[in-house]
Each structure stands twice: as structure tokens, then as C-alpha cells.
Amino acid sequence: MNESPLAFIAHSALAPSGYDVQGRLNSHSAKAVPAPITLAFESSGNRSTRGALRRSFRQSGTKRVTDEQHRVPGPGDGDGLGIPPVAGVPWQAGLALAPPINRATMAPLPWTSNGASESAIGTSSANPGASEAARPVDQNYWQAAGQFRRLVLVGLVLTQTYLATSLMAAVLPYHGREPLEIAIVTLFAILFGWVSAGFWTAIAGFAIVLAGHDRYAISATAVPDAPVSPAVRTAVVMPICNEDVPRVFAGLRATYESLARTDLAMQFDMFVLSDTNNADSRVAEVEAWFETCRALDAFGRIFYRWRQHRIKRKSGNIADFCRRWGRNYRYLVILDADSVMSGECLSTLVRLMEANPGAGIIQTAPNATGRDTLHARAQQFASRVYGPLFTAGLHFWQLGESHYWGHNAIIRVEPFMRHCGLRRLTGRGLLSGEILSHDFVEAALMRRAGWSVWIAYDVPGSYEEMPPNLIDELKRDRRWCQGNLMNFRLSVMNGLQAAHRAVFVSGVMAYAAGLLWLAFLVLSTILLAVQILRDPQYFVAAYQMFPLWPEWHPEWALTLAGVTAGLLFLPKLLAAIAVAAHGAKPYGGGARLFASVLGESVVSMLLAPIRMLFHARFVVTTLCGWGVAWRSPPRNDAETTWSEAWRQHGTQTLIGLVWAAAVYSLNPGFLWWLLPVLGALIVAIPLSVLSSRVSLGRKLRDAGLFVIPEESHPPREIQTTMEESRRADGALPGFVEGVVDPAIVGLLCATGHVRPRPKPALRARRATLVRAALQRGPDDLSPADRMRLLCDPVALAQLHQNLWTAPHLRFAWTGVRASRTARPALRPAQ
């Protein structure tokens, strides 16, 4: 018998005679494997063979097959590929990775266009169920209130900054008249204004949280359980790239199961949009998708799309989805790889969109949860306690011109496709090219086109995860810094609302503040040296008639330091008061709540100087043209090793020691003013290591510190995510299994694309690739060759058949496979 490779896999991977009535392998059913080795693929019958393989998978559960059990069925095994159905995978489910393509366009507009001219857009979108007017139906009843509120904010910040800056100038020896003092006062004014804006945002949020509502809150417009037309369909998409596969599909499963408990479940589809370029992860993703669909009976509801050409990273991934299937949906919910959303939250977002036809984006306020390291637990606590104040405050000032953070948000598809395509930034260097931080830009473009962007700060059921340690947080900040600096170029774009220009500026200040703070401290130290090492100057200005005596008022300096500290700490205290007013028991009780606030303040105070130096370096290196690789962050509790801490923080420790020694030699008393900064830099290495420890985080949790409601009373979605992630951890196939394991090879081939009439050049490349894989084994294959094999079902099937028909060739592959961590057999759903 000399079959085509796909037929070989269809028979051997899915043969029924090797299984007992419970679907388990029968170890006594081994037969001989046919001997011929072929590198040719018979083009005739490809479609029918692949169709038979699909039908077999539709009716069967994938099963792990040992070397002896890999076999071709004999004449007595049944007629053709008649595989008895397996529970959980009905015939109708199929293996459709994605729905049929319904092509549309999503062309980026010129950055100078205001998006109002329909003729300049050239895109048309949706089906009748998704079709909407080109312009939003929005009376902008909130716009006058938003403008007035922002004027009040500007007035408060400017007044407060003026008073503090005047006091700062009075503190300096020459009252801000020397060039060095002018620079110090200027930096202080910018930094104090930045702190003041955050302070007044928290004050506004505190007022809203205590009052319980805001008259302009978007959440107040939805009617609970309001009927939604069946024509209104929503896609939930999760773009991923080389992510932790168990965590991704655990969160997806929790979201799907929660959604299934709502009345709008049948109006949602879910998509995993993969940009993965790692062969091991790619195999694991396909199998995890299949297992998830089989367990949930979700074939045709949960889809998987792998993108071969990774253009424009995440924004390009979403744009690719919109071009293929955007016309099928009115709304689009975007999740991150660590996101979880409740079905009630998703249903509420759809109803909010239906109630507000002028809304283009509604952003939720995700609660951070799921981590156990000390660093992450402090961040989770801060996000859960202080976050509601700041998000409510952002809503208060921005209203319908709010932030969009790129995930855990709902988007109106048609205007998004019309107006939010992202063009490359012209020029050279790191501040040109593809947009990296796309979310702020998309929100600005949506608002520029007339659609409102809201923060639904009080809609519960939205969750995310924090970086597990300081180093991983800073790696993420490095990427965001470059993206925000690029976005600053767009702050002068034609047609933008002032609120979104301010958003671009605030994105830059989030990282430039570190550089400005460092410059302020360095100039202050230089001023100290000048005052000590240089004779006093009594005439510091041209045509000065009377001498200016240098003065030092330590009591004024203490007052200024106290005011600044109050602006930083008071919002945290107010947040704790607001939480206690609504019940502190989910946070460990009132005493532990305030103790946790104090502890988090100490941790943040120690980490702030470390972040300052890193952020300053990020800004400088980005402006100098030093790029950074965008990699997926860890999705588990990764701890920092001592060697990694030395590499990352060694220079900071040296800077802290040298700086402290220099200040002490100049004026020992002045060292106390810089001790909170320099002391943190000196202990950066042990601080980074210890804050990453899971054991310390869990001890604090056991003591009732840094406790959040998602831990004391975990929602069902979080419980499901944790349970499924733990259950699947360590049980994933990789590239080797994707070539050797018949069940997984069958799955990959069944979900792959076969060209019906391959050209001779393709046949030759395929034969060369298979021959190289046979000769070199998996370890010597390049990452690109591995991905090419997985993308070509025919080549994969040829390689698989040759390995199983030639034991001496299979040794290089099975040896690797045997050394891997064993995982449970793939079993039919019970």
C-alpha cells in the first residue's frame, strides 16, 4: 500500500480499532507500519483526502498514540474512514478555524485630514445588521460641561503651580534670579504642575465616588436587560503573540462561560488572533483552541486565526481582522492576552453602545488581579484602591473625549474601519515608521471624526494582570515610552480635539517626568556645590543698584516639601476613606486597609527613584535612536534572580553611592534632603529581588495586607481562569509533537491550507525542506524552517509519514520528544 501522506495520517491518527469503548488506547492493537518512504505528494485527490481528514476529526477526539500503536487500519477496521462519533465533538461542529471571509477595506487617512469628508475615506463597510450613518448620531450634550470642567482644571493647576513655584523661588539663595536657579525653578514648575493635575483628578474622582454617580456618566444611559436586536452582533478578539498559551485560553474560556450565562450569548463570537512566530507556541495554540472548542461545544463560536505576515504588530492584527470579518459585526471588544471580562460586563457594554449611537469607543476600568509577588500585589492593591478615584476623575474632566487603553473596551466597528486606520509616520529614526502605541491615536482619530470616546469607570467585571516584578514592568515601560514619544508628533495633527492633544502630552510626561526630575536633582546638587565652592555673588543682574544677599530659609523649604508630599499622599488617603465608606471588609478590614495604604506608599516611594533613572534613560536612548524589541511580557509570577538584578540595577547602585558621597563631602546636612532618593538607588538590587518574591507576597496576603476583593471574594470568572490555567500548565505540545504525534499532526493538517495544484517550484522547495528536516532533526532546523513546515500541511504530512515508516530517521525526533515533560493524553470530551 502506497498512500499519500495526508491519507496516511487520516488513517493512522484516527483509526478506531486501537481504542476501547471509553476512547482509551488499546495497547494490544499494534500492527506493522508500511515501509515505503516518499517525498512526492500526489496532487490528485488532495481535496478528498483532506476532506476525509476533516470529517474524521469532526467525529473523533484526538488521542495520543505511542510508537507501537501508530498504525494503518486493516480491511477489518470498518468501511473507509467510518469513525464512530465521540462525545463533545458533533459532526456539525466542524473544524472551521474562522468564518468565511467577508472582505472590506480599512484604508488609513492622511494625518492632516480631519476625516469629515466621505470622499476622502473610500471605505464602505457593513452588512445591514452593522450598517450605520457615516456621521455619528450624537447631540454632544456633554461637550459644554466638559469644556467648562477642563477650564476649571487648568485654572486650579496653574494657580496651585504659581503659588508653589513662587515659594520655591523664595527658598533659593538668589530667589530664582541666577541662570542656574532659573533652570531649577522652571523644572520645578513643570513637575509640580504634573503632580497638581494628578491631585485634582483624584479630588474630582473622590467627589464622584462619594456621591455615587455623575450626571454625565455613560453607564447611566443603559437600561438593564433592555432587548437587543438579533442583528446586533459583537466580536470579542484577543490578539496574541508568543504568549503563555494556558493562561490565554484559560481567560478566554472563563470569559466564554460567563458570557454563556447571559441572554446575549448567541450574539457574540470570539477570535484568537495570533501573530506567534514560535513553532512550539503555534502548535500549542492550535491544540488549545481545539481542546477549548471541544470542551465548551464552541466550534463555530470560538475561532482561531494565525497571521503569517506580522504587519504593524497588534494594530495591524486588529486591522486584518476588520478587513476580513469586520462587516459581520457591529461591535468589537478587544482583550489583551491577560484579560478576563464577565458576560454581564460584555452585555452591558453592548447595551451602552445601543443606547448611545454617537459613542465610538467605551473603555472599561480593568481591575488588576492574579499575581502573588510582593511587587505585583502592591500594584494590584494600588490599582484596586486608588484606581477608581483616578478613572472617575479622568471621566469627570474628559467626558466623551476620554482615554482608550487598547483592551477591555468596546468599539463601534464601522467608524473604526472608516477613520482609525493607522498610516506610517514619515521621516527617519525611531520616532517614525509604524505606530507602536496605537490606542491613544485610535481614540483621537475616532473623536476627530465626531464619535465620542468614554470611560465606563463604574462598570464592573473587567480584569487584567500586572507585571510580576519591577524589571518586567520597566521592560514594558521601555516599549510604551517609545510609542508615546512617537505619538507626540501627532499632537499637532489637524482636526484633533484639545483633550486628545493633552492626552498625547500626558503620555510623553509619564516618562519625561523622570528625566525632568533627574535634571532637577542634578541641578540642585550643582547649586549646592556652587554655593559652597564659590564666593557669594551680590550683583547677579545687569544694572543692579543694590546688592542681593544670599538667603536660606529652611522652614520655607520644609513647607514646600510638605505641600508636595501632601499632593502625592492625600489622594491615597482619600481613596482609602472612599473604600472604607463603602465597606473595607473585602480589603481585610479597616485597620489592614490603612496599613496596606501605608505599606504601598513606602514601596512606591522606594521604587520611584529607580523608575526615575530608568525612564530618564528610556527617553534619552529613544531620542538618540536606540530601538527596542517588542516582546510579550510574562504571564506568570516570574521572580528576579540576583544576577539579573545586578545587571539591571548595578549602575544605579553605583550612581547612588557616588552621588551620596559627593553630597556628604560638600554638606553633610544636605544629604538628608536627598536620602529618600539616593538611599533607594543604593538598595535597588535587593529591593528589586525581594519585591519579586512570591513567598513575601503570600505572607503579606496571609497577614491580611494588600488584599483586594478579587482575592477575598473571587468572581467566578477569576476562579475559572486560575483553575484552568493551573490544570493546563505543563501539558502543552510543542513543535516536535506537532511533527511526530499523529493526532496533533492530523489536527494541524486538518486546519491547514493545501494548494490544489502546486507549482513545480513549490514542490521542489517542499521536498528540500522535508529532506533537510529528516537529515538534521528538529534541533538544527531554523525557526523559519519550523514555521514553514507547520504552515504547509503537505510537507508536514510527508515528514510525519517518513518518520513513522523509517525508525532510523525517527530517532532524532523521538529522542527529543521522549526527553520532554510528559503530558496527559488527549482524550475525548466526557
Where are these regions (language model features)?
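C-terminal amphipathic alpha-helical interaction region
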Residues: 634, 642-830
